[in-house]
C-alpha cells in the first residue's frame, strides 16, 4: 500500500522485473509509477487496467471498437436503475461497475431480485466499486476465457480455459471469483477461435493502440458463447 516504501525496496534489492498480478494495484496506477522510476514492469498502466476495473468503461470501449457485446445501461442511482428495470422487456444482469473480487455480478430471476441486487450495490455492498451500476442484457451460453500476452503493440495468445464461477453444483448459486477451471476449452474449435481473434482480440488491440494506451501484460477476455 505504501508506494514509496515499495520503490525503496525494489531499489535496495535491485529488482530487474516487477510483475503486478492483483487488479487493485494496477487500478491505482502502480505500473505507471514504477515505469516513471525506470523499472521494467509486466502489467498494464492505469488506463489499460480500466478494461478490468470499470465495467461501464469496458462496455463503452467495446461499442467504440465494434466488438460484439450485450446491450447495457450505465446508471448512477437506484431510481434510475428501477426505471430501466421496470421498462425493460428483456432479462437483465446487475453488475457493480468496479472491482468486487468476482462477486459483483448478480443474475436475478425476477424484477424484484433485480431491484434487490441494484439496491444492495448502491447501498454500499462493494464500497466505491458500486457507485455506478451496469444493467446488462442477460445472454445464455457457456463461458470461455481467452488470454493475450501483449507488449503494447503486438500480441500472442496463451492457451484457452473454461472456468466455473457459480458457488453450487450444476452451475447454480451466486457467482464467485472462480470455483474451478480447465484448459484448453474443448468447445473452442480452431474455426471458432479464428472468429474470436478477428472480431474481438484484434479490434481490442487496435483500439488500445488508437488511444495510445500502452498495454504491456496479459489481456483477459471473458466471453460467453451464444
Task: Report residues per predicted region.
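CheY-like receiver
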Residues: 9, 13, 83-84, 117
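ATP-binding N-terminal substructure of ATP-dependent carboxylate-amine bond-forming enzymes
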Residues: 1-47
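Internal nucleotide-binding/catalytic subdomain
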Residues: 108-226
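Short, well-ordered alpha-helical microsegments
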Residues: 26-28, 81, 143-144
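Structural detector of well-ordered beta-strand residues that form the stable sheet scaffold
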Residues: 19, 42, 93, 134-136
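A conserved helix-loop-beta module that forms one wall/lid of the active-site cleft
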Residues: 42-104
Amino acid at each position: 500500500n505504501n508506494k514509496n516504501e515499495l520503490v525503496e525496496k525494489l531499489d535496495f534489492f535491485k529488482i530487474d522485473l516487477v510483475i503486478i498480478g492483483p487488479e487493485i494495484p494496477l487500478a491505482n496506477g502502480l505500473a505507471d509509477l514504477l515505469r516513471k522510476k525506470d523499472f521494467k514492469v509486466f502489467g498494464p498502466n492505469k488506463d489499460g487496467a480500466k478494461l478490468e476495473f470499470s465495467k461501464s468503461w469496458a462496455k463503452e470501449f467495446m461499442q467504440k471498437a465494434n466488438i460484439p457485446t450485450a446491450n447495457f445501461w450505465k446508471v448512477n442511482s437506484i431510481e434510475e436503475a428501477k426505471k430501466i428495470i421496470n421498462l425493460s422487456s428483456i432479462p437483465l444482469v446487475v453488475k457493480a461497475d468496479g472491482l468486487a473480487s468476482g462477486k459483483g455480478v448478480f443474475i436475478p430471476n425476477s424484477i424484484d431480485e433485480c431491484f434487490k441486487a441494484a439496491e444492495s450495490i448502491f447501498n454500499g455492498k462493494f464500497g466505491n466499486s458500486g457507485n455506478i451500476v451496469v444493467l446488462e442484457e442477460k445472454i445464455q451460453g457457456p463461458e470461455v476465457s481467452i488470454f493475450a500476452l501483449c507488449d503494447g503493440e503486438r500480441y500472442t495468445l496463451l492457451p484457452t480455459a473454461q472456468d466455473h464461477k457459480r458457488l453450487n453444483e450444476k452451475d447454480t448459486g451466486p457467482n464467485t471469483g472462480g470455483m474451478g477451471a480447465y484448459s484448453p476449452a474443448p468447445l473452442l474449435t480452431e474455426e471458432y477461435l479464428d472468429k474470436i481473434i478477428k472480431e474481438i482480440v484484434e479490434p481490442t488491440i487496435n483500439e488500445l493502440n488508437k488511444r495510445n494506451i500502452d498495454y504491456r501484460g496479459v489481456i483477459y477476455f471473458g466471453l460467453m458463447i451464444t
